[in-house]
Amino acid sequence: MSLIEFLFGRKQKTATVARDRLQIIIAQERAQEGQAPDYLPTLRKELMEVLSKYVNVSLDNIRISQEKQDGMDVLELNITLPEQKKV
């Protein structure tokens, strides 16, 4: 062991770091199964604000739903757009 390795330690290989991070993510997802993500209400609100900023649409015409399909969370966004005026 060289003096530099002793003082600063060895760097972990990127594959090891990536594996450790993935294991943490998987453990968190398993712990949260059956729960809606805590960011979902904020995400819904912000999506509605952005959509209403760029498209003249009523908030009543925007539907956001979250469900599980095949073990994955699916966020579905349905917007009823107003008809465009023909020139």
From Swiss-Prot:
GO terms for biological process, alphabetical: division septum site selection; regulation of division septum assembly
Cellular component, GO, one term: plasma membrane
UniProt keyword Cell division present: yes
UniProt KW keywords: Cell cycle, Cell division
Source organism, top-level taxon: Bacteria
Family assignment from sequence similarity: Belongs to the MinE family.
Function per UniProt: Prevents the cell division inhibition by proteins MinC and MinD at internal division sites while permitting inhibition at polar sites. This ensures cell division at the proper site by restricting the formation of a division septum at the midpoint of the long axis of the cell.
Protein name, as recorded: Cell division topological specificity factor
Organism: Neisseria meningitidis serogroup B (strain ATCC BAA-335 / MC58)
